[in-house]
């Protein structure tokens, strides 16, 4: 679209760019307006949270399966942090954590039968890396009159894409 209409504003480009795409998945908590503001100003933070689902229940336990984790979160360290919460008994309804991942992320949390899943997840979002902020800073080296010297500058979405297209063409 930018090649067809070089005058497109960053605000208009945001209608084509829905939001950041993180390789580990996760849920973006920012509103569309907040994401648009990040693209227009060239800085901000994207709030990321794991995705999870309730698993099967037995008579004595409930299960939660974490199916994706925020970008740049080390899965084994995350499991250790959750295990530390269990060992310290900071969250009594949480009984066990298991990493059942193969090609895809799957962390199993075992809860007491009468536990409130939302309360457990809210605690884990606050006290573990299951919810994080990912800083966005669109600072780039912009070409100057001297081809071998670039000048750092914070850019908006339009400027980043325009400089990229000029570089590639």
What is each model feature region?
Residues 1-169:
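C-terminal interaction appendages of subunits in large macromolecular complexes
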């Amino acid at each position: 679209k930018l090649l067809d209409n070089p005058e497109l504003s960053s605000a208009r480009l945001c209608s084509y760019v829905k939001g950041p795409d993180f390789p580990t998945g996760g849920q973006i908590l920012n509103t569309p307006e907040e994401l648009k503001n990040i693209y227009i100003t060239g800085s901000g933070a994207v709030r990321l949270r794991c995705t999870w689902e309730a698993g099967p229940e037995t008579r004595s336990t409930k299960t939660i399966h974490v199916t994706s984790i925020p970008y740049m979160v080390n899965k084994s360290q995350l499991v250790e942090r959750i295990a530390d919460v269990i060992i310290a008994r900071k969250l009594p309804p949480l009984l066990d954590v298991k990493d059942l991942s193969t090609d895809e992320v799957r962390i199993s949390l075992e809860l007491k039968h009468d536990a409130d899943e939302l309360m457990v997840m809210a605690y884990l979002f606050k006290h573990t890396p299951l919810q994080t902020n990912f800083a966005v800073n669109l600072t780039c080296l912009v070409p100057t009159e001297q081809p071998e010297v670039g000048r750092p500058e914070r850019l908006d979405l339009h400027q980043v894409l325009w400089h990229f297209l000029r570089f590639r063409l």
